């Protein structure tokens, strides 16, 4: 789609890291965002927005284990579920992406429509273990997964891999 109304970039692990080195994809994201009403990402999709130059000097978020890697792209990382900075929105992870999506639904279709959507998807979070205690986060486990994803996804891009790995 050459000029989408909205652009949403999903995240992931090795596949997303590979996408960072796909110049054609990064160029498309940059060009599509130039005309889109809104550009958004979920989870590590924000790294692709960063690679496209869309996060420079903007507040942004991503999965907590990759949060500091946003600095590599000139972003101002913030630890929030989702962030809106102008026409660019970023969500920290999958569940936070639902929060951001409901915000966008309200923006585009009104709060009543967004509430209907919330009922339609039965979104009423009740985590079985309560809220997260970020001081107890299994950082080494997730940083190990991040390092593995970067190693696999950016095997042919050693300089970028090294810069991002240093931020984990």
Which stretches of residues belong to each language-model region?
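Active-site-adjacent pocket-lining segments in enzyme domains
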Residues: 1-168
């Amino acid at each position: 789609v050459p000029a989408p109304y909205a652009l949403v970039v999903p995240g992931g692990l090795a596949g997303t890291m590979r996408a960072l080195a796909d110049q054609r994809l990064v160029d498309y994201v940059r060009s599509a965002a130039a005309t889109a009403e809104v550009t958004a990402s979920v989870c590590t999709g924000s790294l692709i927005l960063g690679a496209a130059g869309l996060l420079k000097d903007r507040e942004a978020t991503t999965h907590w284990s990759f949060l500091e890697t946003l600095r590599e792209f000139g972003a101002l990382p913030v630890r929030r579920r989702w962030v809106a900075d102008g026409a660019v929105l970023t969500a920290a992870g999958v569940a936070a992406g639902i929060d951001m999506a409901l915000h966008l639904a309200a923006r585009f279709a009104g709060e009543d429509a967004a509430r209907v959507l919330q009922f339609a998807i039965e979104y009423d979070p009740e985590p079985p273990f309560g809220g997260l205690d970020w001081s107890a986060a299994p950082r080494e486990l997730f940083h190990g997964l991040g390092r593995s994803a970067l190693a696999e996804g950016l095997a042919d891009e050693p300089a970028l891999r090294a810069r991002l790995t240093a931020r984990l």
